[in-house]
C-alpha cells in the first residue's frame, strides 16, 4: 500500500513539473510577443500580469474560449455588414424608382405645369434623402451598440474565465490593453498550434 501511495506522489510531482515547465514556456513566449507591442502597452504588462495570463492559459480552455469569442465576433460583424449593405441597396432602389417616376411624370406633364411639378419633385426627393440619411444613422447606431455589447460579453466571459486584465470597462486605455492581451493570446495559440503540428 505504501508503494502505491509513493507512485501516486511521483505521478503528481511529474504532472506538477510538466505544468511548471509549460507555465515557464508560455510566460517566455508571452514576454517575447510583448516586445512587438508599442512601448506604452509594454509598460502596462508587468511580469505578474504576464505570469497570471500564462497560468490562465495552462490547460488550453482560454484558447478555446478566445477562439469561440472571435468566431462569434466575426459572424456578428458579417451579419451587421450584410444588414447595412441590404439597407444601402434598398435605398438605392428607392431613389432609382423615384427618379424614374419623376422622369415619367415630367414627360407626361404639360409645359406650363413643369416648374410646379419639378418643385414638388425636388421636395419629395429631399424628403426621401432625409429619410435615407436618418435610416442610415439609425443603422450605424444599432451597429455600434451591438458591437459594444459584443465587447462587454467578451470582457465578462474572459473575466469569469479568470484571465488577467479582463473586466467590463469602456476606458479607451483599458480597451487597448485588453485588445493587445487578446492579440497575445491569439498569437500564442497560433504558435501552440504550429508546434503541435510539428510534433504530430
UniProtKB/Swiss-Prot annotation:
Superkingdom classification of source: Eukaryota
Transmembrane segments: none
UniProt keyword Coiled coil, yes or no: yes
Pfam families per record: DGCR6
Keyword Coiled coil found: yes
Stored InterPro entries: Gonadal
Record-annotated disulphide pairs: none
Coiled coil: 116-146, 176-198
Family stated for the protein in its record: Belongs to the gonadal family.
PANTHER family attached to this UniProt entry: DIGEORGE SYNDROME CRITICAL REGION 6 DGCR6 FAMILY MEMBER, PROTEIN DGCR6
Name this protein carries in UniProt: Protein DGCR6
Species of the source: Gallus gallus
